């Protein structure tokens, strides 16, 4: 079974149909049953609970999350993929909030222009999720993918999503998802196709400055980029970048932490390697989590695309965990190692 185009997926959502969205094989490799919150019905919610069997959530853009005063569930997110769960909610007029009827009642509030935060009680039985502002170009998750797709369809930035679980309780994978879609006459879309679609029409980065520079004693060309959050990221290029495949991503954290660990000497080794063999090191501004290896390199991937890089050899020893969904950005990961 083939994935449908983004254009077809948009038409399906506009018609109020349900879809299955699949993320990357190197991420969760799972599928979510989705539909726009504004087209929610008791029947759809019941189908989701009965057939998909996962946790019913509502993916929201930041604007709606702020409107409904939904704080994150925990101040420090230590989950594998850093999904931005907020506190749970129920409709104020619900009783237990568990039934498909009352969950639908809760979901419809998210799509109501006149609704307000006080229309919810907390905690509840619907799990709101906050999508990153940059969508799939910032984070390659179901949360961002579903909100992006709703917005591309001209709908509100609120989408009902639920993981698809098999009869035996295991998570449904690609082959299982194809069977599920055929059984229920549903189309399936890939997050990677959505990334590719958005990249053809927009970008989250802008080149602010370009100059000759020196990094750790080695001559390099310096590029300063700003993203959609006005955060700056810096790339240092060695030799002819278009002919190079060697890439290093570095999350800029505490200078003190770097200088007092063995990471500093390793970083210097990598910079020396790049200066001798050619390549690029991208310093990404952001908080580096010590509790999870998962990072979202959407911005970094766009910087590489700016340089025309398509095939990369990453200077890293943990590609299986750290670099998720790069293929959606048109990047072919050829190798990943640095001893």
Swiss-Prot record:
The lineage of its organism: Bacteria, Pseudomonadati, Campylobacterota, Epsilonproteobacteria, Campylobacterales. Its EC number is 4.1.99.12. InterPro entries: DHBP_synth_RibB-like_a/b_dom, DHBP_synthase_RibB, GTP_cyclohydro_II, RibA-like_sf. It catalyses: D-ribulose 5-phosphate = (2S)-2-hydroxy-3-oxobutyl phosphate + formate + H(+). Its cofactor is Mg(2+); Mn(2+). Residues 1-206 are annotated as: DHBP synthase. Catalyzes the conversion of D-ribulose 5-phosphate to formate and 3,4-dihydroxy-2-butanone 4-phosphate. The keyword Acetylation does not apply. The record marks 125, 163 as: Essential for catalytic activity. It is an enzyme of class 4 (lyase). In the N-terminal section; belongs to the DHBP synthase family. In the C-terminal section; belongs to the GTP cyclohydrolase II family. GO terms for molecular function: 3,4-dihydroxy-2-butanone-4-phosphate synthase activity; GTP cyclohydrolase II activity; magnesium ion binding; manganese ion binding. Binds 2 divalent metal cations per subunit. Magnesium or manganese. Mg(2+) 2 binds at residues 28, 142. GO terms for biological process: riboflavin biosynthetic process. Residues 207-339 are annotated as: GTP cyclohydrolase II-like. Mg(2+) 1 binds at residue 28. D-ribulose 5-phosphate binds at residues 27-28, 32, 139-143, 163. The keyword rRNA-binding does not apply. It comes from Campylobacter jejuni subsp. jejuni serotype O:2 (strain ATCC 700819 / NCTC 11168). Signal peptide: none annotated. One of its GO terms (cellular component) is cytosol. Pathway: Cofactor biosynthesis; riboflavin biosynthesis; 2-hydroxy-3-oxobutyl phosphate from D-ribulose 5-phosphate: step 1/1. Keywords: Lyase, Magnesium, Manganese, Metal-binding, Riboflavin biosynthesis. This is 3,4-dihydroxy-2-butanone 4-phosphate synthase.
